[in-house]
């Protein structure tokens, strides 16, 4: 849906020429005009309500201004006029009667007064912004040590930088006005546990010997010595004398001279003086008990030679081991042929081996389970 010119412009040669040369096509894509379903009577009612509210506000403001003027004190000029003219009754009637609404001239004077108050407030704010605040003054007074001259010079240099072309990104001011990083405006201060300027040692503490990192004063040492009673000192001196006398008596000889000895002799003396610990040790019983009885003797124990035992001392063998009595001969076994694949020249018959194949019965007879010699573990 396209809508051409919505309103007709006033007839003028310029407008007519513009309409002929230029055209504008308006397309209502979102159908905003069709969605408006409100009643025009509602709009009229709302506008009337708004007008009444405005009138009430204006009347209330006028009453407040009239009350403020009536509550002001009379100036000296008004008093003189009353005394000279003698028209006190007129004044009373005016005050007791209905309050009149302020005129346009009075409104103008009120606006002028408001403008002057705003100007005064702005000037006061500017002066207050440049003044030093009370919290900064208190903090500077808390330090007992004066600021050194080097820091003062640095502060002056930083202030001189703050001209018109000072640091970029700061506008006209250059450096920030708060040169001291500690005195940040509007932030609380907390005492550091690790130590700060306030926690440092004061000169009074240092003179008196108190405070951290101080070795004390001479007065404290004398006061501690005086506080100890005389009897305790006498007892301590007596105990020290007895201990020293005992040590000297041990080291000295009968003649009263100190004895020189070597390290071994001194160790012997120490061992003699040292208390010895007595241990109740038992020796193993070598004697055979009288009630011991031999159950059976092995058959093969006596046949084993001593030489074989000496040569094979490292291996633990049972008493009835018969492996040493077996005669094993590996010479009767067939030897493999050497060389390439088997043997002699061409066309010859394979010769027989010189060693006969004798079958040797290595295995013994089956053991008898009833005999304890054959089954020693079952006995």
From Swiss-Prot:
Composition bias type Polar residues, residue spans: 107-116
Q: Which cysteines are joined by disulfide bonds?
A: none
InterPro entries attached here? HABP4/SERBP1-like, HABP4_PAIRBP1-bd, IHABP4_N
Give residue spans, biased composition: Basic and acidic residues.
71-81, 118-133, 139-158, 179-208
**What are the subcellular locations of this protein?**
Nucleus; Cytoplasm; Cytoplasm, Stress granule; Nucleus, Nucleolus
A single GO CC term for this protein reads: cytoplasmic stress granule
Query: What residue spans carry the region label Disordered?
Result: 52-260, 332-379
**Which biological process terms from the Gene Ontology are attached to this UniProt entry?**
positive regulation of RNA splicing; positive regulation of translational initiation; ribosome hibernation
Q: Where is the composition biased (Acidic residues)?
A: 232-241, 368-379
- Tell me the subunit arrangement: Associates with ribosomes; promoting ribosome stabilization. Interacts with eef2/eEF2; promoting ribosome stabilization.
| Protein name per UniProt | Intracellular hyaluronan-binding protein 4.S
Q: In the record, what lineage is assigned to the organism producing the protein?
A: Eukaryota, Metazoa, Chordata, Craniata, Vertebrata
Gene encoding this polypeptide? habp4.S
